[in-house]
Amino acid sequence: MTVAITQTGPALQEFIKRHQRLFVLSGAGCSTDSGIPDYRDLHGGWKRPQPVTFQAFMGELSTRQRYWARSLVGWPRFGLARPNATHHALAALEARGQLELLLTQNVDRLHQAAGSQAVIDLHGRLDVVRCMGCEQRMPRTEFQLLLERDNPGWADLEAAQAPDGDADLDSVAFDNFVVPACPACGCVLKPDVVFFGENVPRERVERAFAHLQAADAVLVVGSSLMVYSGFRFVQAAARAGLPIAALNFGRTRADDLLSLKVEQSCAQALAFLQQPPDPLHTATARYHSARSA
């Protein structure tokens, strides 16, 4: 497939206007304007060391100490992040009646905060902590109080924000950091997100694929698609013959599958969605949505 590359928005606008049931796959590039760093450079490589793996987190106390210490320092800023223009634009796309599903690889819940409702959090949500024994869950804000109680002084440390709601603590020893256990059963507590090396819950994947089957096109926003859990949906769309557009700076894993690629700020390229829609186009979108319901 020949990839059409443009530096401006008109081609993307036309792509979106042509389709009434868009399957949108979003990534870290959606949230950078909210102050949350992304993971990859323009070539798709890591900007920093790879995130912790599920196996290391579950198997090594030292890994959990390092993870939760960095999270204790970084969470307050992450938790205060607010939706930006990209999140609001995608919420507007849903309000226009053109969204089949917003499948996000992000764990920040900013799409929901902007008003999006048809959302699946592919990799979970960082604002919840889950016990790996009894499955009890608690808000991340509540767990923050436990971390600060057991580790006085750590909350006063200053460090640069990192992508996973944590902070870059490079010259700190974690040996004496206390990791609270589950108050109910004493087992390991983990953020309710999918770590590297951990499987996305099957039910979540199946729901997303069901929506993909009902879609008439795919739009990738702010993702290089280097992680297979997201890339496989684009692969499936290509096999089904769906047109695929990507809005992302730099290389994506799906470049040879795209019918359109736009390298432009997500907020700028999608700004038109927050303008009053053409009445005829809106009526047409609602008609198609009603017929396929």
Curated annotation (Swiss-Prot):
Zn(2+) binds at C131, C134, C182, C185. Its EC number is 2.3.1.286. The keyword Transferase applies. It catalyses: N(6)-acetyl-L-lysyl-[protein] + NAD(+) + H2O = 2''-O-acetyl-ADP-D-ribose + nicotinamide + L-lysyl-[protein]. PROSITE patterns: SIRTUIN. One of its GO terms (molecular function) is zinc ion binding. It comes from the Bacteria. Pfam families: SIR2. The active site is at H123. Residues 1-284 form the Deacetylase sirtuin-type domain. It is found in: Cytoplasm. One of its GO terms (cellular component) is cytoplasm. NAD(+) binds at residues 27-47, 105-108, 222-224, 248-250, 266. PANTHER family: NAD-DEPENDENT PROTEIN DEACYLASE SIRTUIN-5, MITOCHONDRIAL-RELATED (PTHR11085:SF10). Belongs to the sirtuin family. Class II subfamily. This is NAD-dependent protein deacetylase. The lineage of its organism: Bacteria, Pseudomonadati, Pseudomonadota, Gammaproteobacteria, Lysobacterales.
